[in-house]
């Protein structure tokens, strides 16, 4: 098998407030903080390929009347056979990921591509696509004004409810509300800070009891899965917020649902969060930039290596066109 040049598009420091630490998860390894970009590079080398790192802060997009190109440190970029972007921000999404589209315009295969990432980063757009394709999601209503709140709560089944920003990640900007008084107080603060003014009100799936299931999808397969349970006193099961996790075997229905949801969004790689409701599994979240450390540690499966194997396969197929 020939050696490939596999690119890693590193968004670290694009948003210093978020990139200010590649932090270790609770219960993670001692020593250096886990760096997913470094882990991908190590996986590329271990599989016999050459890593090519592009730090976004050093890239310049160039246009003329003939082609689109990328300069790196003001010099023409030597291309790669396939590119794997790693993002670490949730604001200014469309603008920041334009660099991914630029690589696509240079005929470089990208995993994941620009448009699917933009869809997945927007919870509202994700809900629209999943609903159109009849993929089950929690009851959700989108509002902008206080006067619609009471009816909105009734439509999703009453308290408790979940309120979300359209763009939060890792459980941030997600709040459980148990009363009308709490809802009005919380939204007064959230709307003052919100850039979009849009809030998602979602049913609380009580039978999930603070647990969800993360499926790590690569291509058409779930390569790893874990059950996450919220920390005491919280309802969010994200490992980054102190939740606990154990490896799990998903049901055939859940695996099929995760793969199908990934496919309809157009993603190659996705972290799919599933709730087990009384009516069957529902998709809670879709993450186009899923964390690598937690699920690898919990399951013992090297998901970074799985990603690179898939990227190499895409590159080989592309070279034969």
Language-model regions: role of each:
Residues 292-302:
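Short, flexible active-site recognition loops that position polar ligands and cofactors
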Residues 12, 88, 166, 204-205, ...:
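Anionic group-transfer/hydrolysis microenvironments
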Residues 215-217, 280-294:
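A short beta-strand motif that forms the metal-chelation/ATP-contact edge
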Residues 234-283, 305-320:
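A long amphipathic alpha-helix within ATP-dependent nucleotide-binding catalytic cores
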Residues 175-265:
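Phosphate-binding site of ATP-dependent enzymes
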Residues 161, 223-224, 270, 282-284:
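Protein kinase-like catalytic core scaffold
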Residues 1-111:
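ATP-binding N-terminal substructure of ATP-dependent carboxylate-amine bond-forming enzymes
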Residues 6-25, 30-32, 37, 77-78, ...:
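Active-site nucleotide/adenylate-binding loops and adjacent lid/helix of ATP-dependent enzymes
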């Amino acid at each position: 098998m020939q050696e490939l040049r596999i690119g890693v598009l590193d968004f670290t420091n694009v948003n210093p407030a978020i990139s200010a630490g590649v932090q270790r998860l609770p219960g993670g390894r001692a020593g250096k903080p886990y760096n997913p970009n470094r882990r991908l590079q190590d996986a590329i080398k271990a599989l016999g390929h050459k890593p090519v790192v592009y730090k976004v802060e050093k890239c310049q997009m160039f246009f003329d009347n003939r082609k689109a190109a990328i300069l790196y440190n003001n010099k023409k970029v030597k291309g790669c056979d396939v590119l794997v972007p790693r993002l670490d921000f949730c604001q200014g999404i469309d603008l920041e990921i334009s660099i991914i589209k630029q690589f696509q315009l240079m005929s470089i295969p990208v995993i994941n591509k620009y448009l699917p990432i933009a869809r997945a980063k927007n919870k509202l757009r994700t809900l629209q696509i999943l609903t159109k394709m009849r993929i089950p999601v929690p009851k959700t209503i989108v509002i902008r004004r206080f006067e619609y709140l009471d009816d909105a709560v009734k439509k999703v089944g009453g308290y408790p409810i979940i309120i979300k920003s359209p763009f939060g990640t890792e459980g941030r900007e997600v709040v459980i509300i148990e009363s009308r008084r709490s809802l009005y107080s919380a939204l007064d603060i959230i709307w003052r800070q919100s850039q979009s003014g849009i809030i998602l009100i979602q049913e609380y799936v009580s039978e999930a009891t603070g647990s969800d299931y993360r499926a790590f999808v690569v291509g058409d397969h779930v390569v790893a899965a874990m059950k996450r349970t919220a920390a005491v006193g919280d309802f969010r099961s994200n490992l980054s917020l102190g939740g606990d996790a154990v490896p799990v075997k998903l049901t055939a229905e859940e695996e099929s649902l995760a793969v199908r949801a990934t496919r309809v969004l157009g993603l190659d790689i996705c972290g799919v969060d599933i709730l087990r409701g009384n009516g069957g599994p529902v998709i809670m979240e879709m993450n186009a930039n899923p964390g690598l450390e937690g699920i690898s540690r919990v399951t013992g499966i090297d998901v970074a290596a799985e990603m690179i194997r898939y990227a190499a396969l895409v590159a080989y197929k592309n070279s034969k066109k």
